[in-house]
A protein has these predicted regions:
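Short beta-strand-loop/turn "lid" adjacent to the catalytic site in phosphate-handling enzymes
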Residues: 1-21
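Acidic, glycine-enriched active-site microenvironments
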Residues: 13, 179, 183, 219-220
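Active-site glycine-rich loop that binds ribose-phosphate moieties when present
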Residues: 19-23, 49-65
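Conserved catalytic cysteine-centered active-site region
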Residues: 21-22, 26-45
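Short glycine-aspartate micro-motif
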Residues: 69-73, 95-97
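A short acidic Gly-Thr/Ser loop motif
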Residues: 73-77, 101-103, 210-220
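Catalytic phosphate/nucleotide-handling subdomain of diverse soluble enzymes
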Residues: 84-86, 109, 190-242
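Conserved ATP-utilizing enzyme core subdomain
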Residues: 93-193
Length: 242
């Protein structure tokens, strides 16, 4: 799919929709290669969430092992892939994937706000590491409706954008810039640790060591989480033939 400009997941009373910026025929002509596209739109048309799309690719590229395998993608939104074991009673489970909630989006917006637009992200997690997390607010936020939903579910910047950041900052009242970055950073870590343990039996997943993509090294506030450690992982693909 192309760049996602707008995404609205489905509800029981409303069809989902998504707006992608992509000209697949032009891309096919320029590359002189077949281009398979519109996976997101097709999934939504069939009643799916339309996101995340990466779980199938994760399963195809990495395969199954003797136990559960978890893969975490920390983009603007955190999405999680859980690949079941290759054998045993749990080997019949399907690959699971869903959007946990905000990863970098609230952090980046907070950095942009408190740097007056001079910075767009928290380099090496330095700003979060210099602050203190408002733990009480993280616990309250985890009770919000989206975070209580079970998979499948998807979300985007439409829900966790600038307005959402402003709402959270107003809730915390007087907060330093560093604390305003440390707290949503902690929220991202809590969401990822929170979701697998809430899956209904028999899909309840034991604690996982999660590889991290995009931002290969987790920021200090995320790495310091008391939950299962995050192990950096890089996937190397073979060079194209010829």
């Amino acid at each position: 799919h192309g760049q996602t400009l707008w995404h609205r997941p489905p509800t029981p009373k409303r069809r989902g929709a998504s707006w992608q910026l992509l000209q697949a025929p032009l891309l096919a002509q320029l590359l002189q290669r077949p281009v398979v596209h519109d996976f997101r739109a097709a999934d939504l048309a069939l009643g799916g969430q339309g996101a995340p799309l990466v779980p199938r690719a994760d399963a195809a590229l990495l395969g199954r092992i003797d136990g559960w395998r978890g893969l975490l993608n920390l983009g603007g939104i955190a999405n999680l892939t859980l690949i079941p074991p290759r054998c045993g009673p749990e080997g019949t489970h399907a690959v699971l994937g869903w959007d946990c909630g905000p990863a970098n989006t609230l952090i980046d917006l907070a950095v942009d706000r408190f740097s007056d637009g001079l910075r767009s992200f928290d380099l090496d997690g330095a700003m979060a590491a210099a602050g203190s997390c408002r733990e009480s607010w993280v616990h309250r936020w985890l009770e919000e409706p989206y975070f209580q939903e079970l998979p499948p579910k998807s979300t985007g910047r439409e829900c966790f954008g600038r307005d959402d950041l402003n709402r959270r900052l107003e809730q915390m009242l007087s907060v330093s810039p560093a604390d305003a970055v440390a707290t949503p950073t902690r929220l991202s870590a809590a969401l990822v640790a929170h979701d697998p343990s809430r899956l209904p039996a028999p899909q309840a997943i034991p604690p996982l060591a999660l590889p991290v993509s995009r931002g290969r090294h987790p920021p200090p506030a995320l790495a310091a989480s008391p939950h299962p450690p995050l192990h950096p992982h890089a996937l190397r693909l073979p060079p194209p033939p010829g």
